[in-house]
Amino acid sequence: TEFATNDGGQR
């Protein structure tokens, strides 16, 4: 994802 999430997305 483009958003900083706790799922290991694209930060």
Curated annotation (Swiss-Prot):
Optimum temperature 45 degrees Celsius. The N-terminus is blocked. Inhibited by Cu(2+) ion, nitrogen and lead. Activated by reducing agents, such as DL-dithiothreitol and 2-mercaptoethanol. Keywords: Heparin-binding, Lyase. Optimum pH is 7.2. Degrades acharan sulfate and, to a lesser extent, heparin and heparan sulfate. This is Acharan sulfate lyase 2. It comes from Bacteroides stercoris.
